[in-house]
Amino acid sequence: MLETQGFVLLPGLLTPDDCATLAAEVDKYLPLQDGNTARPPNSGGQRNLLKYPWCKALAERLQGMPAIAPLLPTSSVAVQCTYFEKTRARNWLVPLHQDLSIPVAERVEHPALRGWSEKDGALFVQPPARLLQELLAVRLHLDPCQGEDGPLRVVPATHQLGVLTPRNAQALRDASGEVLCVADLGTALAMRPLLLHASSKSTSNRPRRVLHFVFGPATLPWGLAWSKAVLS
C-alpha cells in the first residue's frame, strides 16, 4: 500500500507505556513557557529532536522494527524528528501541500537546488523530486487521533506525480477525494513526503501529540550532507 497509495497505517507500533514514556521525555526536554506546563500557544512544532539521546535511540529502534524495516533500504538514516502538539489552546490547520524541504549541514550552490530557508536554527533546501521520492516519513501517535482531533487528510497515490503546482494539487484532491488518517494510541502513519496532505484544526479537548521522523539515504548528491543522520 505504501508504494501504490503513498501511505500506510501501522497499528500498535508503540505500546501505551512507550507512548507515556516518550511524552514524558518530550516534556522534560522541550522548553516550556515561563516554567509552566504549557508550551507557547504559537509553537505547534519543534524540529530538532534528533539532538536528544532518547530520540536518537528511538530512531534506531524504529529502523529495526519488523513493521518499519521492510519499508526502508538497509542504508537509510534518520535525518529529522519533529514534535507536533495540537490542542485547543495551540491549534492550527495545514493547507494542502507536499513536504519539499530537507535539513542539510551547509549551503551548496547548485542549479538543482532551490528554496533555501532557515527554520529553528537549521538550514533547509528543496531538492529535486527524485531525491524526495526516496524519503519516508513515520508519524508516531502518542495519543488517539480521531476526526475531531485534526488528523492528516491525504490524497492517495499523489506521491508518484512529482512536485505539483497548487492548481494541480487542488484538482487532484477534487477528482480523487481525501482519506482521513485517524489513528489509535501507538499507531504509526508511514508516508511519502510527496504525498499531498493537509489537516484541520482540532475541535476536541484532547491533545494530538505526534513524533514525525524522516528517513532518507545516507549520502546525498550535489555536494549536500544531512545536518544530522542516525543509522541503526
Identify the function of each model-found stretch.
Residues 1-4, 11-118, 232:
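Non-heme Fe(II)-dependent double-stranded beta-helix
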Residues 6-7, 186:
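Catalytic palm active-site di-aspartate
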Residues 7, 135-137, 208-210:
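Short hydrophobic/aromatic beta-strand or adjacent loop that forms the aromatic wall/cage
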Residues 9-10, 97, 140, 189-191:
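Short hydrophobic-aromatic micro-motifs
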Residues 13, 81-83, 141, 157, ...:
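Short, well-ordered beta-to-alpha junction loops that form the rim of enzyme active sites
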Residues 32, 160-172, 176-179, 185-190, ...:
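Non-heme Fe(II)/2-oxoglutarate
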Residues 81-83, 138-140, 211-215:
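A structural signal for short, well-ordered beta-strand segments
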Residues 87-182, 222-227:
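Catalytic core of non-heme Fe(II) oxygenases with the double-stranded beta-helix
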